Amino acid sequence: MKITILAVGKLKEKYWKQAIAEYEKRLGPYTKIDIIEVPDEKAPENMSDKEIEQVKEKEGQRILAKIKPQSTVITLEIQGKMLSSEGLAQELNQRMTQGQSDFVFVIGGSNGLHKDVLQRSNYALSFSKMTFPHQMMRVVLIEQVYRAFKIMRGEAYHK
């Protein structure tokens, strides 16, 4: 089994990098995990709707170029389905039982995900109706993936 977190933009702050590294280490016994960053598109502050769509399209092309045809794509979206930690564990476990073994979680840029990425998605996941910094979302996501594996194995952690 392989998990990839595919995110737009780079982690800059040391504390986010340290948190990600800690969960990568913790996930080691359970699964292979890769973090792939694609460059965010530089854009002015006050963009028109057309310019926002162009930025999302360019970032979307970069995202799609990193996804293999056989990958199960889980996009993080405000409009996605909200799950409990147990629900995420159940969703991943069910998909693994069906033979899916290459999961790609996609975190878009500050303007969201392009429609082509959303169409490629096999599952839309939401952590909240609120907006979070993308760097923080990476840490929350990798922690929840770790928690899901602990739950799937029946190990103590999630309570």
From Swiss-Prot:
SUPFAM superfamilies: alpha/beta knot
Location in the cell: Cytoplasm
UniProt catalytic activity: pseudouridine(1915) in 23S rRNA + S-adenosyl-L-methionine = N(3)-methylpseudouridine(1915) in 23S rRNA + S-adenosyl-L-homocysteine + H(+)
Top EC group: transferase
Alphabetical keyword list: Cytoplasm, Methyltransferase, rRNA processing, S-adenosyl-L-methionine, Transferase
EC code(s) of this entry: 2.1.1.177
InterPro entries, per the entry: Alpha/beta_knot_MTases, RlmH-like, tRNA_m1G_MTases_N
Single GO cellular component term: cytoplasm
GO MF, one example: rRNA (pseudouridine-N3-)-methyltransferase activity
Family matches, as Pfam families: SPOUT_MTase (PF02590)
Predominant location category: cytoplasm
Binding partners and assembly: Homodimer.
Function, in words: Specifically methylates the pseudouridine at position 1915 (m3Psi1915) in 23S rRNA. Specific for fully assembled 70S ribosomes.
Similarity remark: Belongs to the RNA methyltransferase RlmH family.
The protein, known as: Ribosomal RNA large subunit methyltransferase H
Gene expressing this chain: rlmH
